[in-house]
Amino acid sequence: MNKVENRAERFFQQMQGKRVAFCGIGGSNLPLIKIFAQRGAVVSARDRRGYQQVQQAAELEKMGVRLVLGDGYLQDLTEEVVFRTPGMPYHLPELDAARRRGAAVTSEMEVFMDLCPCKVYGVTGSDGKTTTTTILARMLAAAGKKVHLGGNIGRPLLPDIWQIGPDDVAVVELSSFQLTMMTCRPHVAVITNVAPNHLDWHTDMAEYTDAKRNIVRYQQASDRAVLNADNTITQGFSEGLRSDVFRFSRLHEVERGTYLGQDGTLYGRDGGE
């Protein structure tokens, strides 16, 4: 067993016997519910929908998973570890109450990024993040890399953690929902732009912007941040960053990064001509 497998194994060994709740029985949580149950966690799966509407409800019950369904599905959230689905607001009263009781409230992507043994490329933005993530994954694959695509695009990556090697790359699309309160960091972070979006979910524009900034907030000197030089908000993200900053622009030249010249040619610079 290599170092990578050891780390994942240690994590799941720590989960044995722990009471773990999954809030939402959908695409991102369903594979995790099964893995945690198989690995010896005491699992509850919670969903607003009724029994007939929940995918694989009978199978989950056979695995020993306790189902908590219906409008009160978040009541009595007393588990030690709580996985929220990406679209669930971070500061729901029930989640805040769980934190006050000492629960670790987390998500699939947070755990994956913490355990991932390979280089992680993260992409976020108000527009164009899915296209950018897809292009980036294809470019890396064309360069001969084994690419694991996930996050807000594709499928959950945590169930594949044992199949990911240190020489692979993970390319993840990260929404503001996923970035809220996230303290992990991708080795390369790309922000396409930031503009008003999802303000029905976030308290205000400041909270939305702060969530987006989390993708670069915890980067180290060995990491890279790629920012939109034409977007005022993302430009401001460079202040105080420890990572190596590159920029891209359609409107003007940049000192480090890529820009579109007046002749329609794409130019790249690394601090010089």
Segments from the language model and where they lie:
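Short, acidic/polar N-cap/turn motifs at the starts of alpha helices
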Residues: R10, A57, S176, E255-G257, ...
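Phosphate-binding loop of NTP-binding sites
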Residues: L74-L77, P86-A229, I233-D244, Y259
